[in-house]
């Protein structure tokens, strides 16, 4: 029998909080290989829980940088052992957990450019980092630095207009400021600061990869309109910061070819391109194939909204990032803490712990709930900062309780109305071609999705997003190969599996979520 034809492909990587994952996607956009290395399970010597170390103060949260390097060694060796044909890889790209930062020690670039193919990366890069434990997105120890940054630029709203977000503890600029203030010696011995995404890209390049616009938008340092570092923000954080960061680049940039290390050790082709790595949320937007006017709603423990925006209006809530697949446009992220746990609580209290009873309540109550409205925040909400359960009757009077079925509809309509109101606050508008892509646990409940369609007045589709950051990275690698010819991302991914239609708005629904 003839050998199966070799499959040209792109690789998509995801350096996330708990694991490193890879997928291989062929020219027809089929995923035909995937693998992962789990930090807690496969790298016990680093002693992480959930991929991180939570320090004694409960606020500082870090990950060992060499753990990430060793994870890449392990996964590449696993691929080699499985017989994966690296010679067919046209390009690769990847995603990193957002906001985390890596500090390369003076002299590290020479080591990167002269790697020996006979040794794993982690053995050669041991002395290359001025900070061995990298701050990650779960860290909330930089409140003082956040206040300093906002004061330096004229307040929280001014910072948001400039960089897309007010100052957040996890954002990289504030983390860099803390390191400069508390460990000035380590800072002075740092020649380059990478995000987790550009750090991972640097490992493949054998030289420092630039930060891309989209992940760079999560630092409180990048001017999202001009796509350059804000001098005021850099100056407020630390000296000589611009030279340590390098210049940012468009997210679809080809930043180089893989280092000869990968050619000699694993058999990558010398021409294999590295497309700029980005953050995990922007990569997920690519994996879900959002287009202009679309929204993705992830209905999980917390609910997250991804929006495609043309003209953003940055606010004190939510985040605006440069769009990873269209340099002219933007994306927004809104996070809501009271997600599935709140839905489960009301299900337990009002529907005898049964999702089918919960669905019956949504089916038997009318759209708009007879004017009854509720907002349910059992834990302190992020968007907006508010706590408690708030119920309003049709006469707009606060009431202490609703009938069980009204309670259930009030919860779901209220959750989705809040999402629409906050999305519109960031400049989002529902368009005739708008699609809503629903993912996460609650996306399996068609009655919940019907309410979502009615509140936004747009059709809801469901999509499998098990590996959306990884698959999105492979799609972006294909786009990087084509982007030099100005081919739009939507054209590159048109062969990918289509999402499934789950709900269309009920006639008259446009009145429900429309701003009053």
Predicted segments with their positions:
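N-terminal glycine/serine-rich phosphate-binding loop of ATP-dependent small-molecule kinases
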Residues: 1-123, 263-273, 453-460, 487-490
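Active-site core segments that coordinate phosphate-bearing ligands/cofactors
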Residues: 2-5, 11-12, 21-27, 86, ...
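Conserved beta-strand scaffold positions in the cores of enzyme catalytic domains, especially
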Residues: 36, 133-135, 248, 274, ...
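A generic structural motif
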Residues: 37-39, 137, 320
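Short beta-strand-loop/turn "lid" adjacent to the catalytic site in phosphate-handling enzymes
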Residues: 59, 81-135, 163-170, 201-223, ...
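Generic internal hydrophobic packing segments that stabilize the cores of diverse globular domains
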Residues: 69, 73, 128-134, 143, ...
């Amino acid at each position: 029998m003839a050998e199966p034809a070799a499959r040209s492909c792109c690789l998509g990587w995801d350096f996330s909080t708990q694991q490193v994952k890879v997928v291989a996607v062929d020219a027809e956009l089929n995923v035909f290989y995937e693998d992962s290395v789990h930090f807690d399970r496969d790298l016990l010597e680093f002693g992480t829980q959930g991929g991180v170390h939570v320090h004694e103060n409960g606020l500082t949260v870090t990950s060992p940088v060499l753990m990430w390097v060793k994870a890449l060694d392990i996964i590449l060796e696993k691929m080699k052992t499985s017989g994966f044909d690296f010679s067919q890889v046209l390009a690769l790209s990847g995603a990193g957990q957002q906001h985390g930062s890596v500090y390369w020690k003076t002299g590290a670039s020479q080591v990167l450019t002269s790697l020996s193919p006979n040794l794993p990366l982690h053995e050669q890069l041991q002395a290359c980092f001025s900070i061995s434990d990298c701050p990650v997105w779960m860290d909330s120890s930089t409140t003082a630095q956040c206040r300093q940054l906002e004061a330096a630029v004229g307040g929280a709203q001014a910072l948001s207009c400039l960089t897309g977000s007010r100052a957040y503890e996890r954002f990289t600029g504030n983390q860099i400021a803390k390191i400069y203030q508390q460990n000035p010696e380590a800072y002075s011995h740092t020649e380059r600061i990478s995000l987790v995404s550009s750090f991972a890209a640097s490992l493949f390049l054998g030289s420092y990869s630039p930060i891309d616009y989209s992940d760079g938008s999560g630092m409180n340092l990048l001017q999202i309109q001009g796509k350059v570092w804000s001098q005021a923000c850099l100056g407020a954080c630390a000296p000589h910061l611009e030279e340590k960061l390098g210049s940012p680049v468009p997210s679809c940039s080809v930043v180089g070819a893989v280092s000869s290390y990968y050619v000699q050790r694993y058999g990558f082709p010398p021409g294999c391109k590295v497309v700029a790595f980005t953050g995990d949320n922007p990569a997920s937007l690519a994996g879900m194939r959002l287009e202009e006017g679309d929204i993705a709603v992830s209905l999980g423990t917390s609910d997250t909204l991804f929006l495609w925006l043309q003209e953003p209006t940055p606010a004190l809530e939510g985040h605006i990032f440069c769009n990873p697949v269209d340099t002219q446009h933007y994306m927004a992220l809104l996070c809501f803490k009271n997600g599935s746990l709140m839905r489960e609580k009301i299900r337990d209290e009002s529907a005898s712990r049964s999702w089918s009873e919960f669905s019956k309540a949504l089916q038997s109550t009318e759209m708009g709930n007879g004017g009854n409205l509720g907002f349910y925040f059992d834990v302190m909400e992020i968007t907006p900062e508010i706590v408690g359960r708030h119920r309003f009757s049709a006469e707009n009077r606060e009431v202490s309780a609703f009938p069980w079925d009204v309670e259930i509809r009030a919860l779901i309509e209220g959750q989705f109305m809040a999402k629409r109101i906050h999305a519109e606050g960031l400049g989002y508008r529902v368009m005739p071609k708008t699609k809503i892509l629903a993912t996460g646990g609650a996306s399996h409940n068609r009655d919940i999705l019907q309410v979502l369609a009615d509140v936004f007045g747009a059709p809801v589709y469901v999509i499998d997003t098990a590996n959306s950051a990884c698959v999105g990275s492979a799609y972006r690698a294909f786009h990087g190969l084509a982007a030099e010819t100005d081919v739009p991302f939507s054209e590159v991914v048109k062969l990918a599996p289509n999402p499934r239609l789950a709900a269309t708005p009920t006639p008259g629904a446009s009145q429900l979520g429309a701003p009053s």
